[in-house]
Amino acid sequence: MKFGVDVPTCLAGMAYPVPFATADDVVRIAVEAEQLGYDEVAGNDHLSTQRFVREAWPAAPDYFEPLMMLATIAAKTSTVRLGTGILVLPMRDPVLLAKQVATLDQISGGRVTLAVAAGGYRDEFEAVAPDLAEANRNDLMTEGIESLRVLFEQSRSTYDGKYRRFVDVESYPKPVQSPLPIYSGGNGKGAIRRAGQRCEGWLPAKIGPAELAAGRAKVHGYAREAGRDASAITIALQSVVCIADTAAQAREKFRQSTFQLFRCSLNDTMLTGVSEDQYIADSLIGTPDEVCEKVAAFQEAGLDAFSATLFVADTIDEMLDQMRLFAKYVLPAFPEGMAR
């Protein structure tokens, strides 16, 4: 089992208060994650403040561009992998994105994992890309991934899709890794299908072991239909960590944190029908022993990695304390990770 940390590139106002982290704080968290033995650090992606965040806070949050932050982190680290958790692909021009990601892979010596998804907030997408407001985002996802593949792998690239088009693009340098791992982020049918048909990994968020096992089986089914090696596809998960001395203390810490705002913002999308109690049960919330038991249950369900893990906190010091507790009690119980 491998474990990653979601550094707060674009989490203020959502999972954390406003203000929360400076750019220096984001780098400091990533450096400590490597020192603690985590396998990955990942940044999430927003280009504009979402409506629910504007309504909740009087000041606008700082959203740091994740690839630029990861480039800075690459210069301060040596072994930890650099991920996105996730990058909203429909909001990105694929030619520019391919250049940015290939450059980051070169800077880091081949440490990049690119997790992409359609994004959870329609209002943000329509604000940033109004010309694509009526576009099918599943189609945008497919065209985006296909575009990245040809740009990464062909000496000269042409792509003629419904939404994405470019002609005779010669983009160098290529990534160090071939293929550069692309994960399909999301819990829905389209994300699962793309993971099996086109990607090196599947990265859902905030689901329990049973749902993960069912999704994994579907990913493998799509892979076999496409003639791919299903066993080569990484099954990752973005989960939430809140550790305390007692289960009641952990639940109360979660309920009193800013993270509740984030959970409620997803009630009409990926968390439809998921109660607070079920959310807590599915997340890594509890005592150290309870969290280890939950990790073991996910491992039994076929999980390979906890990627872009979110640590419940209302200050940087609280976030670091949670990371340290997890590293002290959980990482040693699952020693297969690269950094351990």
Which role does the model predict for each range below?
Residues 33, 37, 45, 73, ...:
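Conserved, mostly hydrophobic/aromatic
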Residues 2-21, 89-158, 206-217, 264-265:
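Flexible, glycine-rich active-site loops centered on histidine and acidic residues
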Residues 55-83, 140-147, 151, 320-340:
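Alpha-helix-loop-beta-strand connector modules within alpha/beta enzyme cores
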Residues 3-7, 41-43, 82-84, 112-116, ...:
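Hydrophobic faces of well-ordered beta-strands that scaffold small-molecule active sites
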